[in-house]
Amino acid sequence: MRKLLFLCSFLWIGTSLFAQDRVKWDFSYNTSTKEIQLKAIISEGWHLYSQHINNTIGPVPTSFTFTENPNIKFEGEVMEPKAIHEYDENFEAALDFFKSEVTFTRKVAKAKSGEVIKGYVTFMVCNEVMCLPPVDVDFSITIP
């Protein structure tokens, strides 16, 4: 029984790491627009779900969680470009998602040079055959 539990744990960890390989993240700060940019580069054949899908349907929407910092103020929520809207046979529903790459942005209203914006992104990827379990990826963005 312990061996089976260990094997299941190993497989779960392995598939989570595999999901991270399907999406490469780049986190940066744009000084001219004063916004953070959270860019996902998605492997061919895979797609990343929008923040704005109904999570009761099945797939986990992409979400961003920010660590509290009294020296940093945001203006509004995380924005995303227009997503692909298609019927998904696996979930038997029309869903919004991104292929290839997508850049999410959030306007920074107040932050001093040297401040660090920290948090994590939670996301899930699928292809035509399968979905990988949701993954959290930490980020840290220094204001120049």
PLM segments and residue spans:
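Extracellular/lumen-exposed scaffold segments
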Residues: Q20-P144
